[in-house]
Curated annotation (Swiss-Prot):
This is Photosystem I assembly protein Ycf3. It holds the Pfam family TPR_1. One of its GO terms (cellular component) is chloroplast thylakoid membrane. Essential for the assembly of the photosystem I (PSI) complex. May act as a chaperone-like factor to guide the assembly of the PSI subunits. The gene is ycf3. TPR repeats lie at residues 35-68, 72-105, 120-153.
Amino acid sequence: MPRSQKNDNFIDKTFTVVADILIKVLPTSNREKQAFTYYRDGMSAQAEGEYAEALQNYYQALKLEIDPYDRSYILYNIGLIHTSNGKHGRALEYYYQALKRNPSLPQALNNIAVIYHYRAEQATEKYQSEVAKILYNKAADYWNEAIRLTPTNYLEAQSWLKQRENI
């Protein structure tokens, strides 16, 4: 039984019912419907912290989904899981793939910036100031782009960028 059919969360159930109705009435291929079902089940598993199950669903969705925009969100969610698991290098790969298909994905830009900022802090702790400087600059570049796309978001990043200008 698909995960979406055994969910006990009211909001998830509501989303599932609405999604099922849309899948039935929208003029999409069976392949697209199946891809969306895997994606939806992946989101549900991810929300419950079942990352291995979520990844399986996302990988199945990737095999079926052909639309670049939709693929970008699948790739982004895979990146989120790798970030949560501390696999930052792997997460970056998926965020970059998502951006290649959807350059206007500010959340991927933000997450890339967060990883570079984290790595810069690690370099600073190891007294690798030149490496840290490069990584902080990369973080700033990605945050600036994310903020350009969504000026009212990423307030902490905006604050950090302003402080950085004043140093």
